[in-house]
Amino acid sequence: MRHSRDLIEIFGYAAGDNTEFARSLWRLGGCPFIGRGCVKFNHDKSVTYGTCSATSPYGDLVICPNRLYADNYAVIRRVAADAFGSDAPFYLFNQYVGRPPLSETCVVALGAHSGKEVRVGGSLSMDWVLVLLRDHRIVEYVGIEVQSIDITGNYRDAWHAYNRITFGSDPVTIPSSQHGLNWANVHKRLIPQLIRKGTVYASSSLVKRGMYFIVPDPVYRKFEELLGVMPERTEADHNTMTVYTYDLGPRMPFGETRALQPKRNDAFRS
């Protein structure tokens, strides 16, 4: 029987998934959503935890922003299509620099896994900046902030129990996880950062659609609890923040990853 506090996904698959490929990612420390090593370590980097999602009072909740990059950064591509239309080809940084684009107009994504994060106002960084290029010159751009939620406490015992599972092995006894969710950080850090970044972006003549915020739906609902009723949806302009929220899809058989399901699409002036 599953505990009320439990780990849901580790290295992209169900925590208890005993299929061969899922267990190989445990050995490699690999993240299937960004195609490289997981960045969730213990304090001395001797253990790679790979924890993508965990239980919460609001249902299964994404706790690593890289989990939101499933299906080859589909959430980022969705922003590009909304901001610049679906006709302009989309390139990650390595794709753009690796060969000349076939189109005179294209979108290039710059971020932590595609080139580097872009600095904002000298002291802040934006997770992603999508740049619309025409004849290799910048004509417009939008910023994207991607957030999940930090955890408190620890899930060490539960994680090590799941780690004992091997390919094809029988189920093992899993202790309850001792994690909590750092909702206070939403109020103290995330909201002020979004306000500051939105203000900086609104001042640029090359920003015509403000910035975008990608976040798990339960985290956004917590924003609403803290801030009250959000303004009515508005058409996008340079002062606008557009919010896309996502939930994890239904649990899948072992060997398959869960889909991300779009939930909210809000836009209001920041």
Predicted regions and their residues:
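Active-site beta-strand-loop-beta-strand hairpin of nuclease catalytic cores
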Residues: 130-160, 169
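Nuclease-adjacent, charged terminal/linker segments that flank catalytic cores
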Residues: 1-118, 270
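Intrinsically disordered, low-complexity regions enriched in small/polar residues
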Residues: 15, 95-98, 130, 143, ...
